[in-house]
């Protein structure tokens, strides 16, 4: 099939027990996961995006066997756990995955931490890097305001980017961090899958749904191409974290041509209600 046309990291949330809010799919079989991993590897996908909250994923990977084909990134929740317990959990995950280190470790739910906890979390990450547990360290955020309380110890910021949410592209602090070497990784490009099937969006967002459909129609794009065009048309985020429900989906993403739209920033909506742009506020179906 060839190599992926974008710098892609394979998100692994869908491989566990339950994922998403508006699109619930049956738990994926180990056989399907193995197909996805093989396809990803064959097409130059180098990194898997994990988290300690992805229930059952590590166990499945240990059973399938990753065979050291991928770099591993993970995320941890710092606030309610001690550094010692987190370190033990990370060591346990590495052992289960037969890996020596993580490519990256990010603090999950950065906004939930107090200022003192954030300082402590950064020290924790720095110590892990010094010990060789991770090559790179960073944070996972939801809103651009969260960038105001980090420092240059951070090397990676994982943040949402999609048709309904492009705030980071307009943010001065994000640009300054990127200029100073911080790598921005985009997630949620399909907005929990709703941009691939707009009928799954709540009925009270009919206007926003129609606008996205018209955006795709105007540029002659499928819903998949329309969603990916947001990443393709910007230069802040250098890596795209994507999740899939089967190998066919991954194949479609890999084959989807890069579509850069010069007017993208002028066409995407801004100032949308948080009830639409933040999946944490959605009601599970």
Predicted regions and their residues:
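Hydrophobic faces of well-ordered beta-strands that scaffold small-molecule active sites
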Residues: 6-11, 48-50, 70-74, 102-107, ...
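Short, acidic/polar
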Residues: 25-39, 82-97, 141-148
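Acidic (Asp/Glu)-rich catalytic clusters
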Residues: 2-4, 61-71, 91-100, 148-152, ...
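A structural motif
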Residues: 42-45, 99-102, 134, 154, ...
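Active-site groove signature of glycoside hydrolases
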Residues: 94-114
